Structures are given as C-alpha cells and as structure tokens.
Regions:
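Auxiliary Fe-S-binding modules of radical SAM enzymes
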Residues: 55, 63, 73-76, 80-211
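Radical SAM/AdoMet-radical enzyme domain recognition
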Residues: 1-71
C-alpha cells in the first residue's frame, strides 16, 4: 500500500491537502502495520513548508517496517507554486546525520525508486527524482484518470478516452487493440525541465490525474 504523507503536523497537513484527515492517515498506516501489509510512505519535501520534518519522516522507517520514499515535486497544477528538493540535496542532508548509509542494489518492486538502508532501521529510504534524475527510458507507467482517459505520460495532456470506447459498446478486441496502439505511442521522455521557459502542457491538478 502506498500512502502519501508529507508532514507529521496536523496544521501543515491541513494546509497542504485542504482536508482535516491527518489522524485518519496515521490510523491507516498503523492498521496496515497491524495487518502485516507492506507499506510505502511517499513524501514530498517543499522549501519553506516542511523541510524541517525531513528527519522526522525518515524516523518512521526506524519505528516501523515501512519504506519512506521522497519524491521530487513535479511542476503540475499546484505543484508549480512550490520549490522542492532534488535527490542530491536530500542525500547530502541525510548524510550529515547518517554517514554510514548503504545503497540497496536489489530491486524493491518494479518502480523507479532508488533505495538506501540505514543501520538499525526496519525499512528503507527511497528517492524518486523524476526531474533531476530522468528515468523515462525505463518508465513502465500509464495512468487512468477519474474521467476515463488513459494518460501515457504525466507531462503531456494527451491520451485516449477509454470511457468513450466502453460507452460505445466496443468489443474487447477493439479495446485491447486501442490499448496496444496507445502504449506504442508513449512519449520517449517528459520535458518538465522546460517548464520555466514554455510552461507544462498538462493543466489539470495531480488529484484530477490520479497521482
């Protein structure tokens, strides 16, 4: 189970999410642990917002058998209003307190995260740096939005409407072929690094996209 948690403070949680559900998120994490469900906590470090909680979030992987992953903010929707941290910046900060961390070479799933292990911790610390550490050449992700559009890349607004196909009573073979054709058209790479010059084609919020 992946759970988004950028802060351990109720007030900051409410300010970032617009929802007063901090306690429910914590209860969900604890319920996963009690049930033996493998849990990954995804956090985004934002300058001037929650960076002072970096080590507190890391400590969750010591207290519980969870992986804590730091995701570089993407300039989509509200994300364009914030400044984030790169993997390099966070590793430098982490090394100041935990100089003996160990890189984990084996895969932990089929996602893009790179992991390190801190001695004495139950879980690992992961980093997903989509902007400064492009991994487009190994990306195996597509997304289905709430309104039925299959997105091939977060950066681009384009996609195919599976909802229209389903509502037109298209056959399974037709839908399958449409999926295959779409995947073959998946862009080679995103262009988030051009955001400052050209803007981002995707105009929807991450909550609307499904991420």
């Amino acid at each position: 189970v992946n759970i988004s948690l950028d802060t351990l403070k109720k007030e900051t949680f409410h300010a970032l999410t617009g929802r007063p559900y901090f306690s429910q998120v914590i209860e969900g994490i604890l319920a996963c642990q009690a049930s033996g469900i493998r849990t990954k906590i995804n956090s985004v470090m934002l300058k001037g917002t929650n960076e002072e909680e970096f080590f507190d979030l890391i400590a969750l992987a010591k207290e519980y058998p969870v992986d804590v992953r730091f995701i570089e903010i993407m300039p989509i929707g509200y994300g364009q209003q914030f400044q984030g941290y790169s993997k390099k910046e966070l590793l430098t900060l982490l090394e100041s307190r935990y100089p003996n961390f160990v890189s984990v070479s084996k895969s932990r799933g089929n996602g893009p995260a790179n992991y390190i292990y801190l001695p004495g911790f139950q879980g690992c610390i992961g980093f997903i740096d989509a902007i400064h550490g492009k991994f487009c050449n190994s990306c195996n992700r597509i997304r289905l939005t709430a309104d039925g559009v299959l997105k091939l890349c977060l950066y681009y607004e384009s996609g195919i409407s599976l909802k229209q196909l389903l509502r037109s009573n298209a056959s399974d073979d037709t839908i399958l072929q449409a999926l295959k054709d779409a995947v073959l058209k998946k862009p080679i790479e995103h262009q988030f690094h051009l955001k400052a010059l050209e803007g981002t084609p995707e105009i929807r919020q991450m909550s609307q996209i499904g991420g």
